[in-house]
Amino acid sequence: MTLEEVVSRVLRCAVTDVTDESSTRTIASWDSLRHIEVVMELEEAFGIAFPPMQAAAMTSVAAIRRVLQQRGIEA
């Protein structure tokens, strides 16, 4: 599963609408509760765990991608 697929599934939007520019500011359904769901789904999909401070800072697809890449995951 790709990063875009995880985000689109949790936020209930089209995968084609999810880009690196997508963020908590650009997707109305990406509120604080959905953010937790996004983080949990990413952890499950990629078999990793995010420290709380890092998870809180992942407020855009680009930020999430950077964190995943730092861990050697191409999503």
Task: Set out the residue ranges of the language-model regions.
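Phosphopantetheine-dependent thiolation modules in NRPS/PKS and related acyl-activating systems
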Residues: 1-40, 44-75
